[in-house]
């Protein structure tokens, strides 16, 4: 696939929908794409996994080379500022508004206990979470991953049009 797909397609990733057809190609690190291409040309084995430019953590255990049925679990990076303050500083999905809304919903449902959420995002993600006095920050972090969009599973679906027909392929 490395030679059939434009490197920009793999580097940037793509998501789109057509009539009866959908495609989701996750972004990859350009330098790793070059290294994989060189390994491929030399007949060497290589591994190539998604790399989200907006940071965060990524579990590729079930990636399955980008084929349908695979999945990638991604997590926002949550840092402790102090005992009662957390900061989300990296978001692989680059959808900080969804994260903020899911935190507020989880708090309203009693899944997490927070005082308030401040979204200071500009060029970089920065969502500040003020933890309730009767809750530990460690438990809040666990709950944020369990009950909000701070952790989501993404299923790749690499569908490309070749010879005027859709083809599903892996990386």
Residues covered by each model-derived region:
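Intrinsically disordered, low-complexity regulatory segments
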Residues: 1-171
